[in-house]
């Protein structure tokens, strides 16, 4: 138990430090691939491992964007950049996110940033053993509405366990009838999203983040090797195809990834965008539930 808590606290300390550093380098003209490489490299330098590929979701893009191989995307003036990063220490995960405005953004963007940040603060203040999950969603929704914004209703926070980023319990961002009670020792990622749009996300066709699902009979020897490396390196945690390029030839890797997706050996995460094309802000912390409150490990 002591080792587990120490690992969570170390992972939280790492992502907090890297989040602050990365927020400071986000600027007009910065290639996204430079940002994600910086974040992931710094996590390793600080003694952790990336728990998932660094997400850099800009404007209406809401989640699951990381640089694919050869990404030429660049951050621009007026962009609203959501930076979502995670680290693990021996499989124990800390997950955090921040929204950074680049240059001149309008007042609505600042309002939605304030809404998401305050919703996170208010949600954390309600968390303790015995609190119903639905109560957290109510607090988040009411806070975001008080700023004249809408929560993103079909994205949620989540519980985490060792090597498992989403371990089964969803933490809603809206008021819903969920009477599940939090328990002491639960590890939760609380992540409100605020927007002036309709508050729904939809899939985009792109998939740049993946996760191991199961062993499958595979015709291609190379695909079997790729799947073995995925299982060995990342367990059940999300990974990016660009992470595998140091091990495999790019052309054969592309063919293997297609086969692994088709055989359902790995799960592809679609990039998500706000349905009405509106800007979105996000804030996130990881907490450990206690009898009379919680410890925020990513402050």
UniProtKB/Swiss-Prot annotation:
CDD domains of this UniProt entry? MetAP2
Q: Which reaction does it catalyse?
A: Release of N-terminal amino acids, preferentially methionine, from peptides and arylamides
- EC number(s)? 3.4.11.18
Pfam families in the cross-refs:
Peptidase_M24
Q: Does the keyword GTP-binding apply?
A: no
**Molecular function as annotated in GO:** initiator methionyl aminopeptidase activity; metal ion binding; metalloaminopeptidase activity
Residues noted as binding a divalent metal cation 2 in the record, renumbered to the chain: 95, 158, 191, 284
What does the entry list as the binding residues for a divalent metal cation 1? 84, 95, 284
Keywords of the record, alphabetical order, are: Aminopeptidase, Hydrolase, Metal-binding, Protease
Cofactor(s) listed in the protein's UniProt record: Co(2+); Zn(2+); Mn(2+); Fe(2+)
One GO cellular component assignment for this chain's record is: cytoplasm
| Gene Ontology biological-process entries | proteolysis
Top-level taxon of origin: Archaea
What does the cofactor field's note say? Binds 2 divalent metal cations per subunit. Has a high-affinity and a low affinity metal-binding site. The true nature of the physiological cofactor is under debate. The enzyme is active with cobalt, zinc, manganese or divalent iron ions. Most likely, methionine aminopeptidases function as mononuclear Fe(2+)-metalloproteases under physiological conditions, and the catalytically relevant metal-binding site has been assigned to the histidine-containing high-affinity site.
* Residues bound to substrate: 64, 166
Gene3D superfamilies from the UniProt entry: Creatinase/methionine aminopeptidase superfamily, Winged helix-like DNA-binding domain superfamily/Winged helix DNA-binding domain
Its EC top class is hydrolase
Function, as annotated: Removes the N-terminal methionine from nascent proteins. The N-terminal methionine is often cleaved when the second residue in the primary sequence is small and uncharged (Met-Ala-, Cys, Gly, Pro, Ser, Thr, or Val).
Protein family? Belongs to the peptidase M24A family. Methionine aminopeptidase archaeal type 2 subfamily.
Family matches, as PANTHER family:
METHIONINE AMINOPEPTIDASE 2
Oligomeric form and interacting partners? Monomer.
Q: Do you know which NCBIfam families this protein is assigned to?
A: met_pdase_II (TIGR00501)
Q: What is the protein named?
A: Methionine aminopeptidase
Q: Which organism is it from?
A: Methanothermobacter thermautotrophicus (strain ATCC 29096 / DSM 1053 / JCM 10044 / NBRC 100330 / Delta H) (Methanobacterium thermoautotrophicum)
């Amino acid at each position: 138990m002591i080792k587990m808590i120490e690992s969570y606290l170390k992972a939280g300390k790492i992502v907090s430090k890297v989040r602050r550093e990365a927020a400071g380098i986000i600027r007009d003209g910065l290639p996204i691939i430079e940002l994600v490489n910086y974040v992931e490299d710094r996590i390793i330098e600080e003694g952790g491992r990336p728990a998932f590929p660094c997400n850099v979701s800009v404007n209406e893009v809401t989640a699951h964007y990381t640089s694919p191989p050869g990404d030429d995307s660049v951050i621009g003036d007026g962009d609203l950049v959501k930076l979502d990063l995670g680290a693990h220490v021996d499989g124990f995960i800390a997950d955090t996110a921040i929204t950074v405005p680049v240059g001149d953004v309008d007042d609505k963007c600042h309002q939605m940033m304030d809404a998401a940040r305050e919703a996170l603060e208010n949600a954390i203040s309600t968390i303790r053993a015995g609190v119903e999950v639905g109560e957290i969603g109510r607090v988040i929704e009411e806070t975001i509405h008080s700023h004249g914004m809408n929560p993103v209703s079909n994205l949620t926070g989540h519980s985490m366990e060792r090597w498992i980023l989403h371990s089964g319990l969803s933490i809603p961002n809206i008021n819903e009838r969920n009477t599940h009670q939090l328990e002491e020792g639960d590890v939760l990622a609380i992540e409100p999203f605020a927007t002036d749009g309709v508050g729904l996300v939809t899939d985009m066709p792109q998939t740049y983040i993946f996760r191991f699902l199961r062993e499958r009979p595979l015709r291609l020897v190379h695909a079997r090797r790729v799947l073995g490396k995925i299982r060995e390196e990342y367990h059940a945690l999300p990974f990016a195809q660009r992470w595998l390029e140091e091990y495999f030839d790019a052309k054969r890797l592309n063919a293997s990834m297609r086969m692994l997706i088709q055989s359902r050996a790995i799960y592809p995460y679609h990039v998500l965008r706000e349905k009405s094309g509106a800007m979105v802000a996000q804030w996130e912390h990881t907490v450990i539930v206690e009898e009379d409150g919680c410890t925020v490990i990513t402050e």
